């Protein structure tokens, strides 16, 4: 298997063609960004941490019957994944009030929701990734109604598994962002990554943060927070 040409470079990853048909080579970057790229810094070791954590979580979800694009970890900073067409929606699941929800609605951070809330955001940097309703999604024509229902169902299943996974190691899953893609056959797969870049993760007892808010809000050392998550998960799960 050979790493091919660069197809796409985003804020946190580079995507390369693979010599195997239907597969792509993902390379994580040490770059940390926030506020739609307005804040940016290179943090040594971040690529390895995100790759390790995301690989571990995708492998764990696969064992629970939740399909994703993940095939295997290739190196400290690389993964092999199935090629999918990414749906331009971020699916956000919230268990506790935090971040933009607290700011948007004027609710104090840390309040547990009576039930998980699923939100959709339209992936468009120029528009600032706006919050959209299911009616907006229909107008944008980026996903059929039955696909939206499936996205919500899959997001709920991921939430249930991640809550249990993190609770086992004393971590509270506050909220997280998912992305999905379609295979050539039309199957919906979980895609992108699941890491402290895409999840808010607090210590269950102390409420210490182990996620990108460390960088976003200047709350502490990002690499130390991510390493804490990897160390806790690594004690119980192995790819």
Swiss-Prot record:
Enzyme class: ligase
Gene Ontology biological process: 'de novo' IMP biosynthetic process; cobalamin biosynthetic process
One Pfam family here: SAICAR_synt
Chain segments annotated as coiled-coil in the UniProt record: none
Keyword list, A-Z: ATP-binding, Ligase, Nucleotide-binding, Purine biosynthesis
Gene Ontology molecular function, alphabetical: ATP binding; phosphoribosylaminoimidazolesuccinocarboxamide synthase activity
Top-level taxon: Bacteria
Pathway assignment: Purine metabolism; IMP biosynthesis via de novo pathway; 5-amino-1-(5-phospho-D-ribosyl)imidazole-4-carboxamide from 5-amino-1-(5-phospho-D-ribosyl)imidazole-4-carboxylate: step 1/2
Catalytic reaction equation(s): 5-amino-1-(5-phospho-D-ribosyl)imidazole-4-carboxylate + L-aspartate + ATP = (2S)-2-[5-amino-1-(5-phospho-beta-D-ribosyl)imidazole-4-carboxamido]succinate + ADP + phosphate + 2 H(+)
EC numbers on record: 6.3.2.6
Listed InterPro entries: SAICAR_synt/ADE2_N, SAICAR_synt_PurC, SAICAR_synth, SAICAR_synthetase, SAICAR_synthetase_CS
Family: Belongs to the SAICAR synthetase family.
Name used for this protein in its record: Phosphoribosylaminoimidazole-succinocarboxamide synthase
């Amino acid at each position: 298997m050979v790493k091919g040409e660069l197809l796409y470079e985003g804020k946190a990853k580079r995507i390369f063609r693979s010599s195997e048909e239907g597969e792509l080579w993902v390379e994580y970057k040490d770059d940390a960004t926030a506020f739609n790229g307005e804040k940016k810094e290179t943090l040594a070791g971040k690529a390895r941490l995100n790759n390790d954590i995301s690989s571990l979580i995708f492998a764990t979800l696969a064992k629970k019957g939740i399909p994703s694009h993940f095939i295997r970890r290739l190196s400290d900073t690389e993964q092999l994944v199935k090629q999918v067409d990414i749906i331009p929606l971020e699916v956000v699941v919230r268990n506790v009030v935090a971040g933009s929800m607290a700011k948007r609605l004027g609710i104090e951070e840390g309040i547990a929701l009576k039930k998980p809330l699923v939100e959709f955001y339209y992936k468009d940097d120029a528009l600032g990734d706006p919050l959209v309703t299911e009616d907006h999604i229909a107008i944008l024509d980026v996903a059929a109604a039955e696909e939206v229902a499936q996205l919500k169902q899959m997001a709920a299943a991921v939430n249930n598994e991640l809550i249990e996974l993190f609770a086992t190691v004393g971590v509270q899953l506050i909220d997280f962002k998912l992305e999905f893609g379609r295979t050539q056959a039309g199957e919906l797969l979980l895609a992108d990554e699941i890491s402290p870049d895409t999840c808010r993760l607090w210590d269950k007892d102390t409420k210490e943060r182990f996620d990108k808010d460390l960088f976003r809000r200047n709350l502490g050392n990002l690499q130390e927070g991510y390493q804490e998550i990897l160390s806790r998960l690594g004690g119980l799960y192995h790819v």
